[in-house]
Design a protein with these regions (language model features):
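Bacterial Sec-dependent N-terminal signal peptides
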Residues: 1-27
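A cross-kingdom marker for long, charged
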Residues: 31-33, 252-360
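A short acidic (Asp/Glu
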Residues: 41-43, 70-75, 210-214, 339-345
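Second-shell loop/turn segments in exported
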Residues: 35-39, 171-180, 301-305
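Low-complexity, serine/threonine/proline-enriched polar segments
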Residues: 83-153, 233-282
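A structural signal for short, well-ordered beta-strand segments and their strand-loop junctions
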Residues: 59-65, 196-204, 331-332
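Internal alpha/beta domain cores that form substrate/cofactor-binding pockets in large enzymes
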Residues: 24-130
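Extended, H/D-rich, highly charged conserved domains that either
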Residues: 152, 157-292
């Protein structure tokens, strides 16, 4: 599928922050189960943005870590290692001055609320957020500079931008500009249209290590099943492998029902998708537990770590929404998280959950 969005006009980022309120006021969460690959032309996804904008969320969350959670990760974590590569990249740029302090960044944001068309404060903020391990907001500022504000850059602005951040090709290589993501194509344009200056992170990576261990065990057993199948396809284990392969076939057959990107998003947010996605991600899922040769224990451990991660994501959403006094929020998340987060949020007190498909 292909998704793309481009805004020709920047709408001022003036949105007022929600005010703190009672901790247990009713909270509504809309989940957008999104594709991580979005490669179509700009106008294609305006209907999705229009639908989300009509909902008027007080806050928008993305599948990024908060700066505090990211900074707390061990140096061996993949997310932390990627951050260190981005910091090293910035330190090699021509601009060698220190990034903004948190106080100066707050002042830059206040200035941009008054004058959202300014360019240099955004360059400084993009650099600040990158150093601070707030990847989501670094990418948001870079989206604004590369898309709606690009025409505003003078030659001097462009020179400063290159000194601070490097050429856009290099920014793509370090994955700070990712033109095909749901953020660049849908969420950042949505925030821009709504005048909201911040994307809130909610990912949880505390369970990354045990997840990877369980996944590695499952992959090893899956590969052994495949090797045995190629030798003898008549065994009970071979039948298990065929059932595992069938889940992948069913997954792609479901998504290939339509070439229309808006329709694909509807498919991603449907109960039918939740069922086949669960099977794909867990090597066939619960239906294969106990089947000959199936990595039952490893997959069960994967599932346990997956639920823990998604519970952490839900906790992050609800905690921050309560802190900000928000009454309705949008959560954009990879489609595989949609069902698990929905079920977990439904168990949380005073939280109502809707999906993208539930919106008018």
């Amino acid at each position: 599928m292909r998704l793309l969005l481009h805004l020709s006009v920047l709408i001022g980022l003036l949105g007022a922050a929600p005010r703190p309120a009672r901790a247990q006021q009713p909270l509504e969460v809309v989940i957008l189960a999104a594709s991580h690959y979005n490669g179509s032309l700009a106008a294609t996804y305006q209907p999705i943005i229009k639908k989300l904008r009509a909902y008027q969320p007080d806050m928008v969350f993305g599948e990024y870590l908060t700066a505090a959670d990211a900074q707390a990760l061990p140096a061996t974590n993949q997310y932390q290692q990627a951050h260190q590569r981005r910091v090293s990249y910035l330190r090699r740029r021509a601009l060698t001055t220190d990034p903004l302090t948190s106080r100066a960044a707050a002042a830059a944001n206040r200035q941009l609320r008054r004058q959202p068309q300014l360019v240099r404060p955004r360059i400084d903020l993009a650099r600040y957020y990158t150093f601070a391990n707030d990847r989501g907001n670094a990418e948001y500022q870079l989206y604004l500079l590369e898309e709606p504000l690009k025409k505003n850059l003078t030659a001097a602005d462009q020179a400063y931008y290159t000194q601070a951040m490097g050429p856009v090709d290099s920014l793509r290589k370090v994955r700070l500009v990712r033109p095909l993501t749901e953020y660049h194509k849908i969420i950042f344009p949505l925030l821009t249209e709504m005048g909201q200056a911040q994307l809130y992170g909610m990912d949880c990576q505390r369970y990354d290590e045990p997840w990877n261990e369980a996944y590695g065990q499952a992959i090893t057993q899956n590969n052994a099943l495949k090797a045995a199948f190629l030798i003898d396809s008549s065994t009970a284990q071979a039948d298990t492998y065929r059932r595992m392969v069938a889940t992948r076939t069913a997954y792609f057959a479901y998504l290939n029902q339509s070439d229309d990107d808006v329709e694909v998003y509807r498919l991603l947010n449907s109960p039918a998708y939740e069922k086949i996605d669960e099977a794909l991600n867990f090597f066939g899922g619960e239906a294969l537990y106990g089947a000959p040769g199936f990595p039952t224990e490893a997959v069960q451990e994967m599932r346990r770590q997956w639920v823990l991660r998604n519970q952490g994501m839900c906790d992050n959403v609800v905690r921050q929404a309560r802190q900000q006094g928000a009454r309705r929020v949008l959560v954009a998340v990879g489609a595989s998280h949609g069902q698990t987060m929905r079920l977990l949020l439904q168990k949380m007190p005073n939280v109502q959950v809707r999906t993208f498909n539930d919106l008018p």
